[in-house]
């Protein structure tokens, strides 16, 4: 998925959420503190700052799920035998030099 397609899909999803709550753009703007012009632009072309997106998601829901989806998923050991056999070695937590 391209960034533009992702922005468009996110904007469509948020518009559907707004409508499912039976909120007008003006109503959502007032509840979230996001300017009406910003909300309109977001729903039309997907452009929005992360701060304003978070404000909208606080009102419409989904912020916790978005934060959880961005978390690093690590696979732990499933048994003591895996720990003792050393199948998984600790990963370095440093970035590489460019």
Walk through the language-model features, giving the residues of each.
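Short amphipathic alpha-helical segments with heptad-repeat character
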Residues: 8-11, 15, 57
């Amino acid at each position: 998925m391209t960034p533009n397609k992702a922005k468009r899909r996110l904007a469509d999803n948020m518009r559907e959420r707004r409508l499912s709550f039976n909120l007008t753009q003006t109503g959502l703007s007032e509840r979230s503190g996001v300017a009406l012009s910003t909300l309109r632009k977001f729903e039309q072309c997907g452009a929005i700052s992360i701060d304003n997106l978070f404000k909208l998601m606080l009102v419409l829901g989904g912020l916790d799920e978005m934060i959880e989806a961005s978390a690093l998923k690590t696979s732990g050991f499933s048994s003591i035998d895996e720990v003792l056999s050393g199948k998984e070695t600790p990963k370095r937590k440093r970035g590489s030099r460019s």
